[in-house]
């Protein structure tokens, strides 16, 4: 189950912030943001049967390790997104991420459910589903904390460097809350030039926090690739993963 937890940790934790990036930083509507995520979904659909065929021929070890490594590369690539990057810059990395996740998801299912006794197949499937949810929850919480810490450390310095009015603790907390989801804390009464400066600082700070979160997610995916090396032949020639 460890591999499944790490997979969902990296995937859900990282994707949680992409919605804020696409909608709040780039101003896309939910449909536009969803369209940018479609390449990953498409590659999952295309890659799953191919991964299944490969796993049937060579076992799950190589596909899982290769998939987690590819996912780590994609997450590292996403860490390079800046506030002024084009939303379309995400496409190639989402394609790689989808291709990387396909063999991992198929391989994990094959190892967990396929190697369980017939009478326990339902239990094995339930455990896999639970591991996926735990991993996603942990990823969102941990990477959210990492991003929040990065924003908290960077925002006051950037704010002061721009010679903006000093903030009291309550105001600073409100600004951090807005910036943590990629929003700029400006109102209709904010002078246009000041609003532009605040918006630039907010988006750049959010992008910096997202950069750190994606680096952590890439590291987790790489750890999953290393764990995938533990896969070894099981009883009866089947492939079993000792750490699941």
Language model segments and positions:
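Generic "edge-of-domain/loop-turn" microfeature
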Residues: 83, 101, 220-221, 236
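Transmembrane core module of solute transporters
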Residues: 1-123
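Hydrophobic transmembrane architecture of multi-pass small-molecule transporters
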Residues: 111, 132-232, 238-244
């Amino acid at each position: 189950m460890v591999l499944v937890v790490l997979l969902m940790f990296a995937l859900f934790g990282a994707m949680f912030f992409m919605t804020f990036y696409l909608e709040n930083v780039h101003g896309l509507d939910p449909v536009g943001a969803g369209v940018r995520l479609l390449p990953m979904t498409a590659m999952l659909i295309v890659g799953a049967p191919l991964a299944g065929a490969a796993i049937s021929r060579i076992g799950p070890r190589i596909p899982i390790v290769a998939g987690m490594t590819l996912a780590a590369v994609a997450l590292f690539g996403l860490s390079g997104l800046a506030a002024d990057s084009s939303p379309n810059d995400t496409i190639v990395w989402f394609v790689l991420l989808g291709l990387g996740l396909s063999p991992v998801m198929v391989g994990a299912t094959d190892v967990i459910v396929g190697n369980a006794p017939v009478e326990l197949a339902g239990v094995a499937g339930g455990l896999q589903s639970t591991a996926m949810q735990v991993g996603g929850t942990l990823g969102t919480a941990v990477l959210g904390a990492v991003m929040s810490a990065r924003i908290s450390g960077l925002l006051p310095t950037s704010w002061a460097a721009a010679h903006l009015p000093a903030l009291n603790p309550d105001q600073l907390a409100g600004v951090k809350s807005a910036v943590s989801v990629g929003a700029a804390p400006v109102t209709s009464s904010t002078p246009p030039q000041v609003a532009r400066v605040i918006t630039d600082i907010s988006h750049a700070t959010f992008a910096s926090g997202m950069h750190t979160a994606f680096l952590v997610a890439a590291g987790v995916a790489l750890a999953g690739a290393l764990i995938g090396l533990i896969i070894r032949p099981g009883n009866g020639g089947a492939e079993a993963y000792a750490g699941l």
